[in-house]
Amino acid sequence: MTRFVLFISCFFLIDMIVECKKEGYLVGNDGCKYGCITRPHQYCVHECELKKGTDGYCAYWLACYCYNMPDWVKTWSSATNKCKGK
């Protein structure tokens, strides 16, 4: 029984450490946001899940916005914007 409680405690500890909180607009290799205006309804949800996010949608700027992604995922920022007007 003690081992079971220890196992459960470790599981929750690992879950808290690995918890993903990042959100934002997905960015491609060209530095531009993932466009979604002409894509199917579930396109952004699928792209966000590929990046290990929990959910996403086609946002106001007609780009994919994702929730709860790992910190390694690149997201768009006006300060680091490298998109050349595409």
Swiss-Prot record:
GO terms for cellular component: extracellular region. It comes from Tityus obscurus (Amazonian scorpion). Its main location: secreted. This is Beta-mammal/insect toxin To1. Belongs to the long (4 C-C) scorpion toxin superfamily. Sodium channel inhibitor family. Beta subfamily. InterPro entries: LCN-type_CS_alpha_beta_dom, Scorpion_toxin-like, Scorpion_toxin-like_sf, Scorpion_toxinL, Scorpion_toxinL/defensin. The lineage of its organism: Eukaryota, Metazoa, Ecdysozoa, Arthropoda, Chelicerata. PROSITE patterns: LCN_CSAB. One of its GO terms (biological process) is envenomation resulting in negative regulation of voltage-gated sodium channel activity in another organism. Residues 1-20 form the signal peptide. Expressed by the venom gland. GO terms for molecular function: sodium channel inhibitor activity; toxin activity.
